């Protein structure tokens, strides 16, 4: 199916000195990272495609102006992060769909492992909630959902972090 309208990319930021850590966060999400050493690097959502214009993430270092604003936020973000942890589905987020339930589970397991065992990622990335399609508290009955929080990459203030909804759909749409 040819589509004229689509989401082309999401631009995310990382803290100074954390470019490699940001690339690792994308890899944990199942993306393929390509870094040409320019201002930004690319993370492909579909690991089989190399379309630099569609269906991807870009990541670059947060500008000094943003970091100054974030420094002024002091403890104001702590309550926000706690709200996000309690109800991630009610926070600003974007969704990322994977192709198989096995891939969904593997990504979740890898993120949990990194959040517990990786010194650089402990406290920086975590699975906030799982909502299987057949659970009594399912948000959606047509997909399994996992909500992931990280402050390694974000499309807004790094201090507040980024919520990413990882989805596996029971029925794939026709191509």
Q: What positions do the PLM features span?
A:
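Vicinal oxygen chelate
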Residues: 1-3, 5-17, 35-37, 43-45, 51-52, 72-112, ...
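Short amphipathic alpha-helices in soluble, non-transmembrane regions
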Residues: 22-29, 106-115
């Amino acid at each position: 199916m040819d589509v004229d309208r689509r989401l082309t990319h999401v631009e995310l930021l990382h803290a100074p000195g954390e470019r490699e850590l940001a690339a690792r966060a994308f890899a944990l999400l199942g993306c393929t990272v390509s870094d040409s050493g320019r201002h930004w690097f690319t993370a492909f959502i579909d690991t089989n495609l190399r379309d630099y214009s569609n269906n991807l993430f870009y990541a670059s270092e947060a500008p000094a102006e943003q970091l100054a604003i974030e420094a002024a936020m002091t403890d104001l973000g702590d309550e926000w992060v706690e709200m996000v942890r309690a109800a991630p589905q009610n926070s600003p987020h974007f969704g990322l769909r994977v192709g198989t339930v096995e891939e969904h589970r593997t990504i979740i397991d890898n993120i949990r492992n990194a959040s517990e065992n990786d010194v650089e990622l402990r406290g920086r990335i975590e699975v906030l909630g799982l909502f299987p399609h057949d659970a009594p508290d399912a948000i959606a009955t047509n997909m399994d959902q996992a909500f992931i929080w990280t402050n390694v990459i974000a499309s807004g203030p790094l201090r507040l972090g980024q919520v990413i909804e990882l989805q596996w759909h029971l029925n794939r749409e026709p191509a």
